[in-house]
């Protein structure tokens, strides 16, 4: 069963899940997302933690690193999350070539590390604006 965004998630504050194993980068992303008026409902550093937090927090957007070190794959976490939720995903990674293998979830956005704050903020806006669920709710 796929869950869609609620109208308040589309129209205003979006609940955001950050999947990132580096605490400083996770905090930086949390600050950037908060500056846009969205709410970070959870931060996860492993695949299993990300999936569990997505199920409990029901985010409207996911920002995900690909390589979670010993914590598994961000791609695997996102694939499992997208099996239950129809939400936009932005991959933020130092390994963008891993998304060129054809194994990435669709549709996704990609930002290479190191990133500029303006790039993250613009991509969050695009992901929420252009997502099919957001268009239907408008």
Regions found by a protein language model. Name each.
Residues 46, 72-76:
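Acidic catalytic/metal-coordinating carboxylates
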């Amino acid at each position: 069963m796929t869950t869609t965004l609620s109208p308040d998630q589309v129209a205003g504050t979006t609940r955001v899940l950050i999947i990132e194993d580096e605490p400083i980068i996770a905090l930086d992303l949390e600050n950037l997302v908060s500056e846009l008026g969205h709410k970070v409902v959870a931060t996860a550093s492993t695949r299993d933690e990300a999936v569990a937090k997505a199920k409990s927090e029901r985010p409207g957007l996911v920002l995900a690193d690909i390589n979670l070190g010993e914590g598994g794959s961000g791609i695997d976490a996102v694939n499992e999350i997208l099996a239950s939720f129809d939400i936009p995903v932005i991959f933020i990674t130092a390994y963008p070539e891993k998304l060129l293998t054809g194994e990435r979830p669709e549709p996704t956005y990609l930002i290479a590390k190191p990133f500029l704050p303006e790039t993250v903020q613009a991509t969050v806006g695009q992901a929420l604006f252009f997502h099919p669920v957001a268009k239907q709710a408008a």
